[in-house]
Amino acid sequence: MSENDEGTDAAELDEELDELEDELEEDFEEPAAAADEADPTADEPPAEEAADEAADEAEADEPETDAEPADEEPVLDENVMPDDEADLLIPVEDYLAAGVHIGTQQKTKSMDRFIHRVRTDGLYVLDVSQTDQRIRTAASFLSNYQPEQILVASSRQYGRFPAEKFADAVGARARTGRFIPGTLTNPDYDGYIEPDVVVVTDPIGDSQAVKEAITVGIPVIAMCDSNNTTSNVDLVVPTNNKGRKALSVIYWLLANETLDRRGAEPAYALEDFETEP
């Protein structure tokens, strides 16, 4: 792993992550029991040819998986967190309007702690207060890195624009669309880079980026939905990671909170992160 600052080494990075874990009073690493669930990032690093094939398959599936999870008018008084008086970065109605809380009809063991309830239609509802807190934690973590040493990756269609906007806002690097195998692991590849931390939109769609981050030993921050497994994720941000509006809100908040923790004035509005439907 390349150095974050001149004085930062691998031991200090581990200590930093431990402090964040203590702050939230929970472990970021999932127990081995979660291994019985299919985890696309838990396999051994594939050969480059196999990785190319897997990336092509993921790209072919993209239009279907990027459909908005629910085409409905938001219910702005929906029950989405245990404490109705929780202090949030934005009004809870704004989270609801963007559908940040809307999970899938599948739930993994590793995401169970972030789920508030299940709706009558079978959709799991994510705890928005935990989403809000994890955005703050991720921003605090990212603010410790040199901007150019942060990499954000998003293969999902609806995550590409807000991910690129996030990179522009905080000075990070972005790799959107297909993640080319070897980007982090092959020094002979023209697009080879050595970031110190990776942010991904979805551990499934961005599995190649996650695998390479694991190989080179750098931490992974991931937007995770109710159907994700998190065994290879260091810091989970629980959110609807498929919806256009939800991803715009999450990346916007993460950018502004990161800038705020650097002592910079956040200068971006939500509209700057939104794409046309």
From Swiss-Prot:
Pfam families: Ribosomal_S2. The keyword Protein transport does not apply. One of its GO terms (biological process) is translation. GO terms for cellular component: small ribosomal subunit. One of its GO terms (molecular function) is structural constituent of ribosome. Residues 1-78 are annotated as: Disordered. Keywords: Ribonucleoprotein, Ribosomal protein. SUPFAM superfamilies: Ribosomal protein S2. InterPro entries: Ribosomal_uS2 (IPR001865), Ribosomal_uS2_arc (IPR023454), Ribosomal_uS2_CS (IPR018130), Ribosomal_uS2_euk/arc (IPR005707), Ribosomal_uS2_flav_dom_sf (IPR023591). The keyword Coiled coil does not apply. Belongs to the universal ribosomal protein uS2 family. HAMAP family: Ribosomal_uS2_A. This is Small ribosomal subunit protein uS2. It comes from Natronomonas pharaonis (strain ATCC 35678 / DSM 2160 / CIP 103997 / JCM 8858 / NBRC 14720 / NCIMB 2260 / Gabara) (Halobacterium pharaonis). The lineage of its organism: Archaea, Methanobacteriati, Methanobacteriota, Stenosarchaea group, Halobacteria.
